[in-house]
Amino acid sequence: MASHIVGYPRMGPKRELKFALESFWDGKSSADDLQKVSADLRSDIWKQMSAAGIKYIPSNTFSHYDQVLDTTAMLGAVPSRYGFTSGEIGLDVYFSMARGNASVPAMEMTKWFDTNYHYIVPELGPEVKFSYASHKAVNEYKEAKALGVETVPVLVGPVSYLLLSKLAKGVDKSFDLLSLLPKILPVYKEVIAELKAAGASWIQLDEPLFVMDLEGHKLQAFSGAYAELESTLSGLNVLVETYFADIPAEAYKTLTSLKGVTAFGFDLVRGTKTIDLIKSGFPQGKYLFAGVVDGRNIWANDLAASLITLQSLEGVVGKDKLVVSTSCSLLHTAVDLINETKLDAEIKSWLAFAAQKVVEVDALAKALAGQTNESFFTANADALSSRRSSPRVTNESVQKAAAALKGSDHRRTTEVSARLDAQQKKLNLPILPTTTIGSFPQTVELRRVRREYKAKKISEEDYVKAIKEEIKKVVDIQEDLDIDVLVHGEPERNDMVEYFGEQLSGFAFTANGWVQSYGSRCVKPPVIYGDVSRPKPMTVFWSSTAQSMTKRPMKGMLTGPVTILNWSFVRNDQPRHETCYQIALAIKDEVEDLEKGGIGVIQIDEAALREGLPLRKAEHSFYLDWAVHSFRITNCGVQDSTQIHTHMCYSNFNDIIHSIIDMDADVITIENSRSDEKLLSVFREGVKYGAGIGPGVYDIHSPRIPSTDEIADRINKMLAVLEQNILWVNPDCGLKTRKYTEVKPALKAMVDAAKLIRSQLGSAK
């Protein structure tokens, strides 16, 4: 029985690639140094899979930045601003596309489906000249072969590539990206022919777009593309791989009748309905690559349950045509549990990172072939049993509180307009009130203080003194700038999710559980393993301390339940929404303690609310209902005069505007500066919004300092579609990553612009 891995993390068990990339970008090491680290990582990955007994080992899933950008390089589809003309694309052009350079900006980056990984979006149009400009896929296949490892080269499929692209600037909106298929397929043919000539017997084409809601003409594009490739593919075994969701019935029909294809890969973890499609009809003589090991989470597989699923499929496709696989690339999970020396032993026994998932895939394949590793299966069953019965997982009082939520929609009893009146009486704010989103710059010195306190190198007394001094500095800066609603700057926080997770029960933290987000940037998601509760107040001390330093309103700053959920590895033994409600109840306790502590403005960030939106439209309303309900649970118990803010960190939310209104926050601030028109068009089209709203007036992701006139112009554009009595003036995100030399003049320009418009409106402060 054969085994297969869809893809593997690139960063290395201790983020070796991250440090090699950043050293190269900083000019501290050479291209040769970077290539050496990369080659060593690839070699280790291939040898590890080979030693584990994996039959179909992927190559070309390694990348210096992103696999879609690698495909853009392969096709020579470099936007003209990067100065590439012909030949082989080098690292300078490649990294300029990814990161920009001194004279040109980077290409756009966006989320890879509903994961926390991001890809570089190709910019395409009728003028793009395609050419075979990166031989990476062939080179890496040959590199593995030279090490004695036979691999399956992986390419992003041609139709998914085009559907993941965007129109280049200036291209007519009516242009159909799929009309470029005849231009890119010749390059695919060249690559495939070279791989065949180099000795490849299998090739994997990733076509994840098959799981989306696609119109008929898009499905036809797949049929046409593979018919065109058929003669080039002949003599090869061809796997078309899909992942991240169920495949719709119509798409399944199209996929399983593609010409020139010998195998089909499916995510059977998130795509359980796909199992029914397979059982109701699978093409005879074709291979099924069954993704039963979860590539997106860190839990040990239920081997016995997976084996039952696989055995039921064996009868449909035949013993020699069933291949055990991962649900998607292991890129989306952590690298290796072996590096977790400090993690609690019981919790550790419940986990499997990428390296362990490779072993699970092999164990399942062997068990299917009648060679069960009894001790491995027994240890797995024991770990699952311990997880089910552990008192650390179940907290009865949390279960009761969550069960009691049923039957209420947790809305505040008073309408938002009356609440805003009560808040204005208390806060006495000018029109166009100014505020910031929460964090202030985190200096080297501040990070040192936090690090030393964590390592017990300085006392708690010294730590508290240092943080109080930092808060005082931030308060004084805001008062000097004449900002209306202040923040404490969050100097005590390293990360907006980890900070809360460390203080909530039911969370565990890894030392090396890093996952690539984009380029060299990695995130280390907390692990939610049990029922979530709040043992004691988390932020009240710091917020009250900050409020005591000023007469102006001080915002309490919390991360919302949906964002905590979407940025964590979440337990898989109960529905996600149940875990979210538990987090919401913990945040509710904190909100009420902040209110008791004299904090009259409380911000509950939901930066990642849209990120959790399912891929398929049919599933949107259920997700949005429980996500919005979770937010309302957090603040349904406060007085009318307590002002609840939320912040959202993305621009493209026009399709969920009604859910955002349904959150019933008093004020919403939104990352907007890069897409003014998109956001304002919603209100221009007549969406009625009566609560406070603060679309970001300048982009904090850039070091550029905006002028007063520029911000005033932005405010005027907003006033054209929004009432002056609900508009707030704020940057579009937190200021944590900026320097004080950038922040002070930018905030001054913002406050001056607000005052200028106030005076023009005849309502000077």
From Swiss-Prot:
Positions of the catalytic residues: 701 (proton donor)
Functional pathway: Amino-acid biosynthesis; L-methionine biosynthesis via de novo pathway; L-methionine from L-homocysteine (MetE route): step 1/1
Any one Gene Ontology BP term: methylation
Entry's transmembrane regions: none
Binding site for L-methionine: 437-439, 490, 605
Residues that, per the record, bind 5-methyltetrahydropteroyltri-L-glutamate: 18, 116, 495, 518, 521-522, 567
Main location group: cytoplasm
Keywords of this entry: Amino-acid biosynthesis, Cytoplasm, Metal-binding, Methionine biosynthesis, Methyltransferase, Transferase, Zinc
Family annotation (HAMAP family): Meth_synth
PANTHER family: 5-METHYLTETRAHYDROPTEROYLTRIGLUTAMATE--HOMOCYSTEINE METHYLTRANSFERASE (PTHR30519)
Record family assignment: Belongs to the vitamin-B12 independent methionine synthase family.
Protein name as it appears in the record: 5-methyltetrahydropteroyltriglutamate--homocysteine methyltransferase 2
